[in-house]
């Protein structure tokens, strides 16, 4: 069974693609459209465009895009039915997936999806064990003494893994899951001598780890009895890879986009407490350095990142190393320096939520200011270090994209070197990126002053160097897209096999399917009828193609005649052959081609 088209239309009409895409991509208005870094492939120059008017999106680079359903399918790697259900939930329109899929050949879930399902099922069991069983009472008390309310425990899905070697094993086995797959998912361990399986997590408080889409892909089990290690995380699996996961990104994404800033903490416990205190744009890595994949995710949401690591030597070293790397990646980097020996959880516990949020708001420095304040003693007493760090800081400031923030950093840093802001600014000139540094490519770029160059309209590169026949096919399709009556009048006038451009041929077929179910053409609806990025790009290209609104007298008939010339030798090609015969001096061929041209001209009269 198919989902009722009226339900699909209602969900699409209630879902604004700009709002949807903005949850995943930082967008900037460029002319009539919005542009940002593509969420589907890694890039440094924005090539992902959203049209609010047409309710479609498209990437110049990887060619992915479409309407709200296709974007959701791609970004979450789910089926069309699942995308409709997800967006339906978003706009409070009910979609019964079970009824939709009944009596149909539903594909068996992939291994990755089954792994996620296992994690989400056992989470419910862990939560029950924590909140409803005698065995979980000690763990629950431990959490409550550390400020975890019942509401927070439920919100975060925190649970308890009993001290049993087969609690999770038996549960998943009863549910019909493959035990070896549960091992590959990281929920079970294996005895390599007899290949028996047992629970990986035992007698631990269980914190679910979610991916960017909010699906549970792993766990961190915390001891509450002093056993080692303090935290036991899921191993690397097909669905849980530390270099790709930022804890709390699924919850923080909207706030990151709204505030245009992401705050990076050291651990997920700090994130939970900071979020509860009111700091909603916080994330953390899972005990690893910030990876290139992490930076790619961050850059698509914001260009401003604030580091708030623990107030100890290790935290300071990590801040310097991470901040330097982020600055090199073109991000605006800020630092919040916690009091010595404190982490966010301890600060909140000592001073309270309000004091913490006020501190975060008022004690934020540029990375350059933080760095020079850490190095100030060495700068003051070591002349060799003075010169070295002056060059380093000059280079750091030169990497800052905002001239306003750059000037602020100059004013903050100059006193540490006993130089005027003007002298420091002069030093920075030697480290400034050249004017032509800014990248430019086929997707748009920057001029010599760093000003943005508008890319071509979506898909227009497809229309370069078209033949005469292809130009006729393009114009013909454009008129058919504008009016259903025009389509019905001319559909049988053209044999689809006469199209020389295969993409245009497929569009012709798509229009037939589309108008069979719709009375008025709409690009946002039409893209649902295609299943390839190339064809989707062709549809979008045609949508952007400028042509007179009303056809001139006999204009469409002329296009039909040109299209139907395929299979027949055209006068244009005969003239070409005549010229070649003349060049080589073949009189017989010249006579033959002249006769053919005369005959063709008579047919057209």
Swiss-Prot record:
Enzyme Commission no: 2.7.7.101
Q: Which Pfam families match?
A: DnaG_cat_HB, DNAG_N, Toprim_2, Zn_ribbon_DnaG
For activity, the cofactor(s) needed are: Zn(2+); Mg(2+)
What does the comment on domains in this protein's record state? Contains an N-terminal zinc-binding domain, a central core domain that contains the primase activity, and a C-terminal DnaB-binding domain.
What family, per the record? Belongs to the DnaG primase family.
Q: How does it assemble?
A: Monomer. Interacts with DnaB.
The name this protein carries in UniProt is DNA primase
- GO BP term (any one): DNA replication, synthesis of primer
- What function is annotated for this protein? RNA polymerase that catalyzes the synthesis of short RNA molecules used as primers for DNA polymerase during DNA replication.
**Residues where Mg(2+) 1 binds:** 266, 310
Q: List the disulfide bonds.
A: none
GO cellular component, as recorded: cytoplasm; DNA-directed RNA polymerase complex; primosome complex
Mapped zinc finger ranges (CHC2-type): 38-62
Q: Does the keyword Zinc apply?
A: yes
Q: Where does Mg(2+) 2 bind?
A: 310, 312
